[in-house]
């Protein structure tokens, strides 16, 4: 898994790998079913159900966690936050991809979508909007 992997790209790789190896795994199981290990239920962990509400970015997190959160929620439900335009109107903005700048001091959105608008690049609209980085 690469550090820039999104949920969607991971699913595509995992499904392809599973499809390529399904026959081998089934043959191995059928020839030696006792070789399987039972699942250790004490090691289970839970992640809350994904909804559009749980996709809101928490700006109190560190930049690495926010960037990973954005990748994990692509293709659904897509991480989001609020932006303010020059007239001080506030809009919801989905962030499809982002990166941490060179000096590791800021998260830079890449592909975004302002509520009611088409998907675009942040560089094309950042002069009209500013991120609201509070919860």
Which functions belong to the PLM regions below?
Residues 1-46:
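Donor/substrate-binding cores of folate-linked one-carbon enzymes
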Residues 10, 54, 113:
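Conserved short-loop catalytic and cofactor-binding motifs
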Residues 11-12, 47, 67, 126:
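Generic detector of well-ordered alpha-helical segments enriched in charged/polar residues
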Residues 37-39, 46-48, 75-77, 81:
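Proline-rich low-complexity regions
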Residues 41-50, 90-93:
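Amphipathic alpha-helical surface "interface" segments used
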Residues 48-60:
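Acyl-group handling in specialized metabolite and lipid biosynthesis
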Residues 59-135:
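An anion-binding loop in the catalytic cleft
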């Amino acid at each position: 898994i690469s550090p820039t992997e999104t949920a969607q790209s991971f699913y595509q790789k995992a499904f392809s790998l599973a499809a390529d190896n399904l026959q081998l795994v089934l043959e191995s199981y059928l020839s030696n079913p006792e070789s399987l290990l039972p699942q250790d239920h004490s090691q289970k962990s839970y992640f809350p159900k994904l909804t559009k509400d749980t996709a809101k970015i928490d700006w109190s997190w560190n930049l690495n966690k926010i960037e990973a959160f954005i990748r994990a929620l692509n293709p659904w439900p897509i991480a989001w936050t609020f932006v303010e335009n020059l007239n001080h109107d506030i809009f919801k903005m989905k962030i499809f991809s982002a990166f941490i700048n060179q000096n590791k001091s800021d998260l830079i959105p890449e592909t975004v979508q302002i509520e009611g608008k088409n998907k675009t690049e942040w560089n094309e609209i950042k002069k009209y909007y500013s991120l609201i980085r509070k919860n």
